[in-house]
Amino acid sequence: MAIVLCITMITIPTFAATEKKPTLMILPSDHWCEQRFYMTTWDNQGVKVKTADYQTAFLQDRELTQVISKLGELLTKQGYSLKDAEQETKAVFNRIAEDNVTMSSTSWSTLAETPLDMIKKRAKMDILVQIDWTINSDRSVTFTLEAFDSYTSKRIATSTGTGKPSNEIVPIMLEQAIKSKIKEFDKQMDTYYADLNQNGREIVLTIKCWANWDGNLEIENEEGDELLDVIQKWLKKNTVNGVFNLSDATETFAQFEQVRIPLYDEEGDALDARGFTTMLRKHLVKECEITSKVMTRGLGEGILVLGEK
């Protein structure tokens, strides 16, 4: 099989000129949902997995909405913009049956995503904030706040504390307890996001080959570069400071971890794993005449399957 492989590079800016606070979305923690029986079973390609049932939690627990609203007010005062967790969750769960898999239009190959992956992908928030709280016997409230990078699921900030005993409603008790801790929580997130601005956002990029494709990652161009070499040279030019790590590679599979991509594209729009992987897809189809399909898991993993759509 004759395939012409070329190495045309595209460069993109490291980050937008004007830095801005990341976008947040607030959800209850898995522990909070478990304690209140807001859990559901998700079918992960035949394996039953328990996951938080956010839709039922929002429908049945009025206190949750009030708590998220109060926490949202505190974070908004720190300069963050918020995604509406209840509306985003409702939209995802209403379409979960049809959106649960992504398929190849010709081979019907599937790629499963968790409900939380789908919420992240739809909402496109930078950081997921999860809250857990417990009412103690003396009418004080103990809380835990955790912030996670929506792309990597890495914990980037945490705060815990106990408020003074109070006869106020729970949302007010939590607001009072969290208020004294919010600046330190904000500082942790700021430090992390400053690193992203400087060094790029971290994603995972996976390259696969359809079983019915007669090519693989070892086919060579006229200069003797294998397809995997071509992809790595493109990554070196298009990642921030050329940072990525080839963690695994075979004839038909390659996985790149710690791939540092710019926060924003040339138009100043937020760049996620799908956008970055699509850039590589366009490069391969234009310069190397290789058709491929882009898939994603959440915001932070791009999967490029070579050989067909």
Which residues does each PLM region occupy?
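Bacterial N-terminal signal peptides
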Residues: 1-11
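Solvent-exposed coil/turn segments that connect beta secondary-structure elements
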Residues: 29-32, 87-88, 146, 150-151, ...
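N-terminal segment of the mature soluble domain
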Residues: 40-113, 121-122, 225-264, 269-285
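Extracytoplasmic
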Residues: 19-21, 62, 66, 70, ...
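Sec/Tat signal peptide C-region and signal peptidase I cleavage site
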Residues: 12-16
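C-terminal basic regulatory modules in eukaryotic proteins
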Residues: 280-309
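Amphipathic beta-strand/beta-sheet edge segments enriched in Tyr/Trp
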Residues: 123-168, 299-309
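C-terminal/domain-edge helix-coil "capping" segments
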Residues: 17-38, 154-243, 297
